[in-house]
């Protein structure tokens, strides 16, 4: 029988989400934030999640701001999760327009 694929946080039932919130609270202080870097149009940053927290990230779609905040990511408003980096799913890539 094939192994059941892991579910991301947003696919879990209420009990699963409660258990996941304990993990999120425990690991939130271990989230690493890059310095910002720029091109002509955008500023960028990447966020590195602990591997146990990264298991809760959806792998087939980008997250809304509300969703990545639920996973414990803390940054100012306006950042957009813009790309999934398949080789390193624990690295979240964000951008926002330059001001």
UniProtKB/Swiss-Prot annotation:
Gene3D superfamilies attached to this UniProt entry: Cyclin-dependent kinase, regulatory subunit
One biological process term in Gene Ontology: cell division
Top-level division of the source organism's lineage: Eukaryota
Keyword terms, alphabetized: Cell cycle, Cell division
GO molecular function: cyclin-dependent protein serine/threonine kinase regulator activity
Matching Pfam families: CKS
Similarity field: Belongs to the CKS family.
Biological function: Binds to the catalytic subunit of the cyclin dependent kinases (Cdc2) and is essential for their biological function.
Annotated PANTHER family: CYCLIN-DEPENDENT KINASES REGULATORY SUBUNIT/60S RIBOSOME SUBUNIT BIOGENESIS PROTEIN NIP7
Quaternary structure and partners: Forms a homohexamer that can probably bind six kinase subunits.
Protein name per its UniProtKB record: Cyclin-dependent kinases regulatory subunit
